[in-house]
Amino acid sequence: MVRPGALAFNRRTAQIATMCELLGMNCNVPTDIRFSFSGLIQRGGRTGPHRDGWGIAFYEGRGCRTFHDPLPGCESKIAELVRTHTVKSLNVICHIRKATNGRVCLENTHPFTRELWGRSWAFAHNGRLKGVKDWPLRFYRPIGTTDSEHAFCWILDQIRRRHPTPPKKDMAVLRLVRKLAAKLNACGTSNMMLCDSRYLYCHCSTELSWLTRRAPFGEAHLIDTELTVDFAKETTPRDIVTVIATRPLTHHEPWQVMERGRVVVFRNGLQVGA
């Protein structure tokens, strides 16, 4: 259990240290992201300094719907649209930006998306990667100027080089992603989320926490805004929902701090390939 006092202290200190913040969700049934999104978006200029844009990618079947805005999340009409309309998905990646590499503009907002093997892949990153923009690319090119997007293109390049077609065993991709994440981590800070519509890959370089909600469900209270949800009224007993965030979003829930240097993968709301 995370102590509320510790969360308040971490929130103040992280405003200085954290360059961006990430939010991911992976579930076994389509689940509404609005509660967690409502907490994260407050950190986009109101309770946090991440005013340089925001974005969300969520899957609907094999398709991936994205919204981006270079405006602060707490002021964005598009963010308000997402926050007030039902958004249910098995996999979601959100990002609020504190620009450190690349100017503030639409093309530099995360998550980034590309196609591989006929699937939409989404990626968001927190940190700085020294020298990564010098790494050669073959199949993919950045649209913007961030080191994050270059790293994403490089990851997919490496996966495509090793596996031109989908490997028979999904764990082959997991093993490769772990190696690629370690190489990126050697260049600086690489907290990242990567999704192929089925698996959500999360790498912790400095700071990520995660929480799995399942029956019996209870109430949850956001840290950054006055909002409470009783999940017992919003779910069924079979629902399994895992939320991953740079910093915990709620009080009095058993958030787990992810081990630094580790890639944790989720499918259907559960950790796989541990």
List where the protein language model places each region:
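A conserved acidic, glycine/proline-rich C-terminal tail/linker
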Residues: 219-262
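Gly/Ser/Thr-rich active-site loops/lids in small-molecule metabolic enzymes
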Residues: 144-147, 205-229
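Catalytic core of PPM/PP2C metal-dependent serine/threonine phosphatase domains
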Residues: 166-206
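Extreme N-terminus nucleophile/cap motif
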Residues: 12-77, 220, 261-263, 269-274
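Glycine-rich phosphate-binding loop plus the immediately following alpha-helix
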Residues: 132, 138-162
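Conserved beta-strand-loop-short alpha-helix elements that form
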Residues: 20, 121-131
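Cytosolic regulatory regions built on CNB/CRP/Popeye-like sensor folds
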Residues: 61-65, 119-120, 131-140, 198
